[in-house]
C-alpha cells in the first residue's frame, strides 16, 4: 500500500501546482498582454471614472436614456452573481403578466409612439445581463429620448446608427446596439449644448 501512496501523493501535488497555479498564471499573463481590456472586464470609463462594462447591462429607467432588455436577475437588476436561465416558460401566466407590464410602461413613457414594440424590449435574455438591444428596439425609443433631452429626432437617430454594431464577420449574430455606450454618447452630446 505504501508503494502506491507516494506516487499518488506526488501526482496530486504536481497536478495541483500545474492546474491550480501555473496554468491560471500563464493564461492570466497571456490575456493581460494580448487583450488587457477584455481581460479586465471590458470596462467603460468616462472622465476617469468607470461607468460599467460593455458586457453587462445596466438599469436605465429615466426617460432621457435608452432602456435595455429586462433583467432576469431579480431582485437586484443586472446582478452578475444571480445570472441564470430564469425566464418563464411560454405558457406561464407570469410571463404574460411581465410582458404586459413592460408594454404598459413603454406606452406610458411614450404614449404617441405608434411603432410596434420590439420583443427584446419586453422579454429578458437568457442570462438576464444582456447589454445590447436590437436596432429596432433603439429606434422605438428615439422619439422619447429626443423629447426628454430636447434634441432633434434626427440627431438621436444618427447616434443610434453610429452605435449599431453589425454582424460579426458579416454573418454571425444580429445587428445590435450597446445601451451603455449609447447612453454615454447621449450624455456627451447633452453636455456640449
From Swiss-Prot:
Subcellular locations according to the entry: Cell membrane
* Lipid bilayer topology: Single-pass membrane protein
Q: Name one Pfam family in it.
A: KdpC
Keywords linked to the UniProt accession: ATP-binding, Cell membrane, Ion transport, Membrane, Nucleotide-binding, Potassium, Potassium transport, Transmembrane, Transmembrane helix, Transport
Q: Which residues form a coiled coil?
A: none
Which family is this sequence assigned to? Answer: Belongs to the KdpC family.
Q: What is known about what this protein does?
A: Part of the high-affinity ATP-driven potassium transport (or Kdp) system, which catalyzes the hydrolysis of ATP coupled with the electrogenic transport of potassium into the cytoplasm. This subunit acts as a catalytic chaperone that increases the ATP-binding affinity of the ATP-hydrolyzing subunit KdpB by the formation of a transient KdpB/KdpC/ATP ternary complex.
How the protein assembles, per its UniProt entry? Answer: The system is composed of three essential subunits: KdpA, KdpB and KdpC.
Record's PANTHER family? POTASSIUM-TRANSPORTING ATPASE C CHAIN, POTASSIUM-TRANSPORTING ATPASE KDPC SUBUNIT
Q: What is this protein called?
A: Potassium-transporting ATPase KdpC subunit
What taxonomic lineage is listed for the species of origin? Bacteria, Bacillati, Chloroflexota, Chloroflexia, Herpetosiphonales
